[in-house]
Amino acid sequence: MILHRGARPLEHFDPDLVDLPVKRTREVGIRVEVDTEVRGIEALGAELLVHAAQRGQDRRFEADAAVHSAGRVPEIDDLDLEAAGVERETRGVIVNEFLQSVSNPNVYAGGDAAASGPPLTPKGDHDVAVLVTNLLEGNHRTPNYDGIASAVFSVPPLASAGLTETAARAAGLRFHTNWRDTSAWFNTRRVGETTSGFKVLIDEQTDRIIGAHLLGPHADEMINVFAVAIRLGIPARDLKETLFAYPTHGSDIRFML
């Protein structure tokens, strides 16, 4: 059983692709309860009773074990930032484009400790290089998260790079979307998987890929190809003409463009 606080799981990923594994999860007998906020867990002998609120109603769920997977918060509460005049939000220190505190110019923050940018592990490595450069040489370098890839290591994996359709529309971009359920494709069936799909967003004016969203075997590796294409501005037509080793899952990329 999965108890999820939001209206749908994995809110930051493409909803059409998220719907596929959620549907499959329910088909194999796993309950997915959304809009459900856990209020407490009570031990009843060898079992657990989970108390929750769902759409204004009190709910109780019996379980043998409970796993907390709500993510992480920055470990900065003990730094006494207020004493140093460092403004912060729930997500972390409020910084400018140079990762410098907006309220104390002697303080820099990056990775999980900064309130801006994607909450992903590679961001930390990237931010360190940026803020150290600015500390030593003066503010002139800014972080660039274009095309940064993220993945959910589920079975099968779900991965994303670039913009979602919602973000692309909000940015006023003109683009077309290639979207398909590929559960019947050879590379999905040959490894015994039942669920896969993709959605790729391509700018109508430049032919550049602005977003890629993958679900299926090795999606967590394939997304890195799209991350490179997005960051370097490789046209979709050029990537489509690239011949990948067959029958790797990467050989399906040209059919997504």
Cite the ranges covered by each PLM segment.
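Short acidic-glycine loop/turn motifs at beta-strand connectors
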Residues: 45, 89, 204-206
